[in-house]
Amino acid sequence: MKVLNFGSLNIDYTYQVDHFVRAGETMSSESLQVFSGGKGLNQSIALSKAGADVWHAGAVGAGDGDFLIEQMKKAGVHTELIEHLDGQTGHAIIQKDPAGQNCILLYGGANQRITREMVDRV
């Protein structure tokens, strides 16, 4: 099966915390992990691992977006339809507490700069 997925690409910065930061509070985290993420990217990788031939379309920013493209290539996803745009790649700042609950702050970055013309080219 061949799949074309046009979806978000984000870098997830996941911080392990004792509790979620409250208004006015500054807190240190216990650890930081960096993951590839975004609903679209996650779907493409899952489909590829399940045996589908997947092409992903979307956008990343200059520089740090290459990390996401490499992760997708390692999973067997075709990345030729991903555009590199000026500015930052989308990212999420994720707080994760000991119970496994999370709080997420999302910056859309390049995902928010996708144009109708880019969609039409795909």
Residue spans of the language-model regions?
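Conserved N-terminal subdomain of the carbohydrate kinase-like
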Residues: 25-26, 49-122
